[in-house]
Amino acid sequence: MNILLTNDDGWNSPLLPFTADYLREMGDLTIALPQDEQSWTGKAMTRFGRLQVEERELCGVTGYSINGRPADCVNLALHHLCSKLPDLIVSGINMGANLGVSFIVSSGTVGACMEGNIAGVPGIALSQCLQPETYREWTNEQHLPAATVDDLCRHQREFLDAALADLRA
């Protein structure tokens, strides 16, 4: 499986090494992240200015640091940086909850998945709400069960329908 990893918290997210290491075991991983934190940017993209890409490495995986928003990162990765179109986009793990309409439509984590969906690539937006001082402890103690990711991949439409039903309520 070809996987694209992005987030809205950038390269300094304490959850990034854990997420990258886990996904690397699931398949071929490409990482495309904003160079700086880009929370609350939704699916906004850079309209003016020039996007710059810097190659980086994390957990033995080639990655790209982009001076744009999460949706920019996904767009550039899908159309210019990935050697093959990914089978899945994983956005996150977001540092904070993305619950409720205002959070969902404002989340750069979710916006990155929306950008991928426009290109026909399914995405999973992951969030974890903890106190900042407990993130590093959490990454040492927890894991993301492969069965959970597999289940999300198999039942994409069901989860999307459930999320939209909640938004309409």
Question: Can you say where each PLM-predicted feature lies in the sequence?
Answer:
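Nucleotide-activated donor-dependent transferases that construct or modify glycoconjugates
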Residues: 1-9
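A cross-family phosphate/adenosyl-ligand binding-site feature
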Residues: 3, 14-80, 84-85
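Charged helix-capping and loop-helix junction motifs
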Residues: 104-111
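N-terminal glycine-rich phosphate/adenylate-binding segment common to multiple enzyme folds
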Residues: 73-103
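Short glycine-rich anion-binding loops that position phosphate/pyrophosphate groups of nucleotides
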Residues: 9, 37, 69-70, 94-97
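Glycine-rich, Lys/Arg-enriched anion-binding loops that position phosphate/diphosphate groups
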Residues: 114-169
